[in-house]
Amino acid sequence: MSSIQLDGTHTPVKRGGQAVAYQGRKKSKPRNMLILTDSRGTPLACSDPVEGNHNDAFDLVPTVEKMIGRIQSSGIATDGLFLNADAGFDVKDFRDYCYQQEIVDNIDQNRRNGDVEEHFFDELLYKYRFVVERTNAWLDAFKAVLVRFETNAVHIGKH
């Protein structure tokens, strides 16, 4: 395995419960999760669900640290991996974490950050990131049936 993809998914929750909060942009109460996949879109690790009023970069380093720990505990080496993520993950603390873990970050630059230092960015490798979008679409369709009516946040990752 040479690259992993990171993205977040936001699922509307109809019956309330844990880890739910109003998101004005979605005009609903979603629940957010981050997902790490391999280059074929197979999920490697998911974050714990968080309230939907947070963006993907909320509490990013501790969240990804747990996810990387789960991957490493299953015997998969993460040093030297390329990590693709969209501009929403262009956060200095997260780039520093990737550097410390010997993970090469291939994150699109967030234009809202202003003029910042140049980072390595491989557009050809970045195209692999879209497999995580396909995985998110599948998970959203599945969760549309299951999670929308699940009120207990503990049960979300158990299915």
Please describe what each predicted stretch is.
Residues G88-D90, R111-N113, A137, A144-V145:
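Short Gly/Pro-enriched loop/turn and capping motifs at secondary-structure junctions
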